[in-house]
Amino acid sequence: MAKLAVVRDLRDAQPEPAPEEVADFETDVFAGFVLARSAAGLSDSTIRCDVSHLEQVRAWLDRPLWEMTPADADTYFGTVLRTAPVNTRLGRSQALRTYFEFIGLRHRVQIHAMTGIVAQCPIDEINRPRGQRRPALRIPPTAEQVRCLFTGWRAELATCRKFAPMARNFAAAKLMSQVGLRVNEVRHLDLADIKWELGRFGKIHVRHGKGARGSGPRERMVPLINGADRTLRWFVQDVWSQLGDDPDRPGAPLYCSERHNADGTSARIGTEGLRAPLADAAAAHLPDWSARLTPHVLRHFCASQLYFGGMDLIAIQETLGHAWIATTMNYVHVHRTHVEDAWVAGQQRAADRLKGLSS
């Protein structure tokens, strides 16, 4: 009877890697993950959020993420994140699952050859965090409070040290409160995106609307209602030339930074350049909302005021650029009265029945 021969691996034996080599390889893998997500069309903010989740898990684990086991995930999600908000737990879990899917497709063989570890996702059907992402309930400031904010801010324009930058910040915040644009949509507006000839009041071409599920930016036309046309006319005619360079230049930004590009043209303002002045104005003129008033709160305020003024949900949905009407309903909850109306109608029906019994 033939005997079984000893099978020997003919591949070159891999020496144990130095810690520096493992660290460099981990950095390369992480950089490849970021590049792959960018290639998939995800926005920079989404990628930054995933990276933040992974970095926090890595800091807790204190070793490469591919060494994380289901037992480690049980400890992390069962103790460290036990009392964390549902959205935090779900986001961190999804980031880990996506990262390990990337490792499995691109680097599993290399990781095994280098470390002897077979990388597997530590999140399974047993320990996967349950729950559903729900938007936070936001109650925007009242119309009187927002009026007080912009009245005080406008008065400050007469005495401020730099008129043009403050007027730019004022006009951008005012526009967000009037037609509900997102801060990233506002910063990407060009001067040529204002179409005065369209519609009754003019329209603005939003080219960088928020996308979803890798759709990329969603464009839309927003009518300059609710006084937005007056805000933009004042800014373009009286302020823009103090910050911008050539109004006929293709791609000239609507809201310019004080800095310039390498070629001498006006640079585009960043999102933080719009957020910080709004926070400062709220602290000065609306202290009840200090550290709470953001561009997104102004967006909720706009939706609530449009609904309160009689605008239907479909029109508000188109103005805000929502893909689903259910999202818009979360924005106008403050002024919706269907519960109160149902209660009043029920009381009236009960009163009518009692009248019939007493007659």
Residue ranges and their predicted role:
Residues A31-A136, E156-R161:
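N-terminal core-binding DNA-recognition domain of tyrosine recombinases/integrases
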Residues C148-V183, R249:
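Basic, Lys/Arg- and aromatic-enriched nucleic-acid-binding interface segment
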Residues M1-P17, G346-S359:
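C-terminal secondary-structure termini that scaffold catalytic or DNA-interacting sites
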Residues H188-L232, W240-S241, D246:
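Conserved tyrosine-mediated DNA breakage-rejoining catalytic core shared by Y-recombinases
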Residues I225-W289:
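Active-site/catalytic core of tyrosine-dependent DNA strand-transfer enzymes
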Residues A158-R161, R275-E318:
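Short, basic (Lys/Arg/His-rich) helix/loop patches that form interaction surfaces
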Residues D9-A13, V109-W153, K210-R213, E258-A267:
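Flexible interdomain linker/hinge and immediately adjacent N-terminus
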Residues L320, A326-A345:
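Catalytic-site neighborhood detector that most strongly recognizes the C-terminal catalytic loop/helix
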